[in-house]
């Protein structure tokens, strides 16, 4: 088993607390609205706090698949949110899980900086560049889609 870690940073014009709320507390409602393949997000275990497991269902090219999302830690005061993709058809078979540690920081002009550490836990000793790049692309797409939703809904 190998662990491959990567860091990424993304800026936003949305205020930190508002962006954090959209990316965490309200994401179950927002994500199916802004990411077309995602049909639903449902809690399958837990009460919404650490340890909660969610099933995210998507349809790609007429095929339904899902991933299991486990909330590892949440700290609203420090705007941190850690979770892992722990299973499902949407998790590449070469991976045991993907862990995400995210933090929203104040950015310039009242905006935000989203920092994320991603750890790929592989079954073997190699991480495919394709798997890595797809996960990074999806993460950035999710961030930008939720940011776009907040910007398009000023009363959010």
From Swiss-Prot:
Sorted UniProt keywords: Allergen, Calcium, Cytoplasm, Hydrolase, Metal-binding, Nuclease, Pathogenesis-related protein, Plant defense
Keyword Cytoplasm listed: yes
Enzyme Commission number(s) of this protein: 3.1.27.-
Tissue: Expressed constitutively in roots.
Main location: cytoplasm
Domain of life: Eukaryota
Localization of this protein: Cytoplasm, Cytosol
Positions of trans-zeatin 2 binding: 28, 54
Matches recorded under Pfam families: Bet_v_1
GO cellular component, one term: nucleus
Tagged with keyword Cytoplasm: yes
Binding, trans-zeatin 3: 133, 136
Chain residues that bind trans-zeatin 1: 8
MF-aspect GO terms: abscisic acid binding; calcium ion binding; cytokinin binding; melatonin binding; protein phosphatase inhibitor activity; RNA nuclease activity; signaling receptor activity
Annotated residues for binding of Ca(2+): 32, 38
GO terms, biological process: abscisic acid-activated signaling pathway; defense response
Induction: In leaves by pathogenic bacteria.
Function of the molecule: Class II ribonuclease (RNase). Binds to cytokinins. Interacts with melatonin.
Similarity comment: Belongs to the BetVI family.
PANTHER family: ABA-RESPONSIVE PROTEIN, OS08G0374000 PROTEIN-RELATED
Protein's name in the database: Protein LlR18A
Biological source species: Lupinus luteus
């Amino acid at each position: 088993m190998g662990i491959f870690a990567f860091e990424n940073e993304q800026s936003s014009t949305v205020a930190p607390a508002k962006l954090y709320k959209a990316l965490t507390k309200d994401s179950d409602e927002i994500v199916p609205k802004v990411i077309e393949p995602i049909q639903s997000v449902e809690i399958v275990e837990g009460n919404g706090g650490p340890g909660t497991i969610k099933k995210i269902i998507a349809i790609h090219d007429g095929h339904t698949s899902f991933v299991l999302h486990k909330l590892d830690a949440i700290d609203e005061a420090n705007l941190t949110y850690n979770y892992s993709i722990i299973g499902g058809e949407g998790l590449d078979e070469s991976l045991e899980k993907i862990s995400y540690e995210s933090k929203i920081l104040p950015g310039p002009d009242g905006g935000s900086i989203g920092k994320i550490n991603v750890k790929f836990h592989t079954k073997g000793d190699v991480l495919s560049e394709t798997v890595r790049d797809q996960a990074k692309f999806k993460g950035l797409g999710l961030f930008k889609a939720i940011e776009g939703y907040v910007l398009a809904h000023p009363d959010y």
